[in-house]
């Protein structure tokens, strides 16, 4: 490193004086985050490791107040980790809904970490979209991924990664009263949501269990490696309909809730929107899903040439699953054409006129939600194995949504659906 590079510092954007003692990790640790990770991380313990002088930095705390108070961007934790790992160029990646705060966060990190920030503006639909590959190609040595859980383990990424869940404070009292008003005392409710509302789900669980006025059993389901009470649009727990009276999703929109409804069509589903505080009964047309997806599989059975798509949006694609499917498709006598796409659109696939059917290893919801819009069958890995008679057929009572389960297709494995009770 030249003398000029050492002396070059980002322009300061906040008024105040920084202490030299805050510029680096006092322990001088050079542990690489991507090479070693403890099996379980105690969040409270991690917070306690942040130096008190950083937590009490008046200038930093004043800058943090520029961000909405009900959104926890964990700025202290981020600054501490960037300093600890002596990162020089840091990529920050967040969903479009949070990009409005990206420049404020960028300014804060540049000033208090003395590093360069690169804002990644491409779409980030979920945790599967973490784009450490692109960040590394931009010479970044650290990436902060916002608003999604640790779906992609930090010990396999190409650069150091910090996941910030961006937990959101909501009116928990209103949520509790809403559930008490709408469900009989003693009801067994599977409550889940996106990672932003996970603390609220666990907090209300204890309060409702201890309520003498109107006790409810809140059961945050878990499909590993997701956290208890967490659900994704492609991954949710298969629940026992004899043990659960209802499902309640905390969050806006239906995308993630639909995963649980598809996986558990016989359990009533409800949604609590924490932004407008509305509580609604939600339904999903499972019969239509079965008809549309079964039709796509039937059409694909006669295919001779199959386009096998590897999703290249972040880490959506899985090479092991692609290779496994390629082997099986070739063994069935089909010609396989491998295609790499960051995003999959009907117009794009229509250009491959001589391909009879497509199999996409990216996001199963592309096929489930939008498969009808493609002029050729677009199958998921699971549906492809059904077509090849290597997996059980779905029906109106069961369609698996376990893509990122520890043994799921999203992890390069082949799940066993034979032991699922219907």
Swiss-Prot record:
It catalyses: L-histidyl-[translation elongation factor 2] + S-adenosyl-L-methionine = 2-[(3S)-amino-3-carboxypropyl]-L-histidyl-[translation elongation factor 2] + S-methyl-5'-thioadenosine + H(+). Keywords: Cytoplasm, Iron, Iron-sulfur, Metal-binding, S-adenosyl-L-methionine, Transferase. Pfam families: Diphthamide_syn. Binds 1 [4Fe-4S] cluster per subunit. The cluster is coordinated with 3 cysteines and an exchangeable S-adenosyl-L-methionine. Gene3D superfamilies: Diphthamide synthesis DPH1/DPH2 domain 1 (3.40.50.11840), Diphthamide synthesis DPH1/DPH2 domain 2 (3.40.50.11850), Diphthamide synthesis DPH1/DPH2 domain 3 (3.40.50.11860). Its EC number is 2.5.1.108. Its main location: cytoplasm. It is an enzyme of class 2 (transferase). Its cofactor is [4Fe-4S] cluster. GO terms for cellular component: 2-(3-amino-3-carboxypropyl)histidine synthase complex; cytoplasm. Pathway: Protein modification; peptidyl-diphthamide biosynthesis. It is found in: Cytoplasm. [4Fe-4S] cluster binds at residues 128, 234, 363. It comes from the Eukaryota. GO terms for molecular function: 2-(3-amino-3-carboxypropyl)histidine synthase activity; 4 iron, 4 sulfur cluster binding; metal ion binding. InterPro entries: DPH1/DPH2, DPH1/DPH2_1, DPH1/DPH2_2, DPH1/DPH2_3, DPH1/DPH2_euk_archaea. One of its GO terms (biological process) is protein histidyl modification to diphthamide. Component of the 2-(3-amino-3-carboxypropyl)histidine synthase complex composed of DPH1, DPH2, DPH3 and a NADH-dependent reductase, predominantly CBR1. Belongs to the DPH1/DPH2 family. DPH1 subfamily. Catalyzes the first step of diphthamide biosynthesis, a post-translational modification of histidine which occurs in elongation factor 2. DPH1 and DPH2 transfer a 3-amino-3-carboxypropyl (ACP) group from S-adenosyl-L-methionine (SAM) to a histidine residue, the reaction is assisted by a reduction system comprising DPH3 and a NADH-dependent reductase, predominantly CBR1. This is 2-(3-amino-3-carboxypropyl)histidine synthase subunit 1. It comes from Kluyveromyces lactis (strain ATCC 8585 / CBS 2359 / DSM 70799 / NBRC 1267 / NRRL Y-1140 / WM37). The gene is DPH1.
